[in-house]
Design a protein with these regions (language model features):
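Acidic, PIN/NYN-like endoribonuclease modules and their adjacent C-terminal/linker elements
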Residues: 105-144
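Active-site-proximal, substrate-binding regions of enzyme catalytic domains
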Residues: 42-88
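Alpha-helical elements of the RecA-like P-loop NTPase motor core of helicases
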Residues: 20, 43, 80, 123-124
Length: 144
C-alpha cells in the first residue's frame, strides 16, 4: 500500500501528466490518503482547478467505497511525529513543508508504507527518514 499526497489525486481528477501513473498505482494495489490530504485534494480541485464539487465527489467516492483508496484519520501519535518532522526539517526558503505534508510523512513512516508525490520537499524528507518514494511528474510533466 502507498500513502498518496494530495497531488496524485488532483492529477487524477484534473487529468494532469501523472494521471495515468496514479491510475496504475490504484489498479495495482490499495492506496491510503490521510484525511488532511484528502481535504487538500478537494480544496485544490475546487478552488484552483475549478472542478465542480459534485464531480470531485463522484470521482472519489467510488474509490473510497470499494477500498481502492482508504482515508486514514490522524491521531495523537501522527500529530507528535508530524510536529517533530516539521520542527527538524522545515525551512521557509529551502524546504517548505506544510503540516499536511508532515502528516503524510508521519502516516507513511508509522505504517512502513511508501509515499507517492511530486513535491521535492516531501521526497527529500521521506528519503532522509527512510520512507520509500513513488516520484510522480508534476503538473508540468517534470519529475522530481
Amino acid at each position: 500500500m502507498t500513502f498518496l499526497d494530495a497531488y496524485p489525486l488532483v492529477a487524477l481528477l484534473a487529468n494532469e501528466p501523472a494521471a495515468a501513473e496514479v491510475e496504475e498505482l490504484l489498479r495495482r494495489d490499495r492506496a491510503s490518503v490521510a484525511t488532511v490530504n484528502l481535504c487538500e485534494t478537494i480544496d485544490v480541485c475546487q478552488r484552483v482547478r475549478a472542478l465542480p464539487a459534485g464531480e470531485i465527489r463522484d470521482a472519489l467516492q467510488p474509490l473510497l467505497l470499494v477500498g481502492t483508496l482508504v482515508a486514514v484519520a490522524s491521531g495523537e501519535e501522527e500529530a507528535w511525529l508530524a510536529a517533530d518532522l516539521r520542527a527538524r526539517f522545515y525551512d521557509r526558503k529551502t524546504l517548505a513543508l506544510s503540516l499536511a505534508d508532515c502528516l503524510l510523512l508521519a502516516h507513511a513512516r508509522m505504517s512502513g508504507e511508501d509515499v507517492a508525490t511530486s513535491d521535492p520537499a516531501v521526497i527529500e524528507v521521506a528519503r532522509s527518514e527512510g520512507i520509500g518514494v513513488v516520484a510522480l511528474p508534476d503538473s508540468t510533466g517534470a519529475r522530481p
